[in-house]
Amino acid sequence: MLERRCRGPTAMGPAHPWLFSGPSQESSQPNRGLRYQGKSVAQPGGPAPVKVHRCAHCRKRFPGWVALWLHTRRCQARLPLPCHECNQRFRHAPFLALHLQVHASAVPDLGFICHLCGHSFRGWVALVLHLRAHSASKRPITCPECNKRFWRQKQLRAHLRRCQPPAPEARPFICGNCGRSFAQWDQLVVHKRVHVAEALEEAAAKALGPRPRGRPSVTAPRPGGDAVDRPFQCACCGKRFRHKPNLIAHRRVHTGERPHQCPECGKRFTNKPYLTSHRRIHTGEKPYPCTECGRRFRHKPNLLSHSKIHKRSEVSAQAASHTGSHLIAAEPMAQPALGVPLGSLRTPAEAPASLHSCTDCGRSFRLERFLRLHQRQHTGERPFTCTECGKNFGKKTHLVAHSRVHSGERPFACEECGRRFSQGSHLAAHRRDHAPERPFVCPDCGKAFRHKPYLAAHRRIHTGEKPYVCPDCGKAFSQKSNLVSHRRIHTGERPYACPDCDRSFSQKSNLITHRKSHIRDGAFCCAICGQTFDDEDRLLMHQKKHDA
């Protein structure tokens, strides 16, 4: 909020002389929150460029530096993280950590210094990671295995499932050949294929008999067999490897060790490539582009699965463009060039269908499990239940994303402003706020928007559509927020309470109007001429005279 009392420029102290120096004056003090050295933007039809003044906190732009200064005071008052040295406020902890090193370090060469313990770091990312160690001591729940601390018992249970090796009684399926145990039946079935392959190799060797003397074959086994080719053997299951790093990575299957930890969300992995692939979720990196449509993917298997869609469409197009007249030869040849009779060759139209189709909507899927997941949309089945609130979900990924609402986890961070999100889709939508492009254009008036839902809501102004109907009185609204606000009339809900008295309101605008009654006369003071106003809006209107 704006300053409640008129103290004048001199009452601010000599520490902030740059607040009252105009754009033409130079100041050695670095700007805190103000950026009046904005880019010059030429107005269409005007000869001289106009400077753009941008707020460093919310990126809003203002035509004059006075309006920017007034806005910055209100913007900083709403920020949750205050600096205890100079009372400046910040929205995100990394920005506060960057600011604190100005107070903590008198010598710039020391780098980034922790204000709690005095440790210095070369980069601010290392300082932010170090600050987490101080906050970790306040977490009440401790892991009995690795002493890692958590805020909630649910986070500890999820952590124990990752870091604790499974107990012997949790592996009831035992292989009869080597004695290795497994937690699931399908894992044992996959493992038994190793012994089947070994038995087939032995039977083939006995049937072929000893190799003739002479020059050994390229594929002839060396003396000692696997002991020479694969000298590194696992002491738990007897599996052999050619290289020692492969054996070390394999041992983690038995020990449950996960040494590679994600610095963003704390999830651990057995191999570094798994961690590298996982970190792309936080960074948003998608290094695998499709050469057909340009769509990008985070993992290579996803790209390979996507490319099959284009291949199937090409096959369907070829089958539709060709007719049976030139696919069938007049006189079938006895032996084509490839050595296969033409009668045994199948055209793309005759190829067996390997897709699984939905009986309700006709949509096809490559795998049956994808079809089962899709059919839950028609049946309404929601087998995954949240243990905290009992809400049901049709997909496990939706349950995992929902659980972050209870745990408070926000693993997806914006590189521009540091704001964190619980879902990657929310981060992708937020990134458009930083981008200058507005790809969604209204065909009626030409107004552009960054997000498609904003365009859909705007178009209802032209069409007059009101899809949101109140179930109590039947009144219709074009925006869902208007319906939510209207329903408080029927429910009697008043979520906006005045902090100065006991009154509460159903609309936020009514609360803002009411709070002006608590403000004393002359509470809002102009920093340029000293004139006072009872209303903040009147002060802003007055400031436009100075900007002009």
Swiss-Prot record:
It comes from the Eukaryota. Homodimers and homomultimers. Found in a complex with RIP60 and RIP100. The modification N6-acetyllysine is found at K39, K272. Its main location: nucleus. Expressed in the liver and in subcutaneous and visceral adipose tissue. One of its GO terms (cellular component) is cytosolic ribosome. Sequence-specific double-stranded DNA-binding protein. Binds ATT-rich and T-rich DNA sequences and facilitates DNA bending. May regulate the expression of genes involved in cellular fatty acid import, including SCARB1/CD36, and genes involved in lipid droplet formation. May regulate the expression of LCN2, and thereby influence iron metabolism and apoptosis-related pathways. May regulate the expression of genes involved in glucose transport. The modification Phosphoserine is found at S27. The keyword Protease does not apply. Residues 1-47 are annotated as: Disordered. A zinc finger (C2H2-type) spans 53-75, 81-103, 112-134, 141-163, 173-195, 232-254, 260-282, 288-310, 356-378, 384-406, 412-434, 440-462, 468-490, 496-518, 524-546. It is found in: Nucleus; Cytoplasm, Cytosol. This is DNA-binding protein REPIN1. InterPro entries: Znf_C2H2_sf, Znf_C2H2_type. Pfam families: zf-C2H2 (PF00096). The lineage of its organism: Eukaryota, Metazoa, Chordata, Craniata, Vertebrata. Keywords: Acetylation, Cytoplasm, DNA-binding, Metal-binding, Nucleus, Phosphoprotein, Repeat, Zinc, Zinc-finger. SUPFAM superfamilies: beta-beta-alpha zinc fingers. Residues 22-31 have a biased composition (Polar residues). GO terms for molecular function: chromatin insulator sequence binding; sequence-specific DNA binding; zinc ion binding. It comes from Rattus norvegicus. GO terms for biological process: positive regulation of D-glucose import; regulation of fatty acid transport; regulation of transcription by RNA polymerase II.
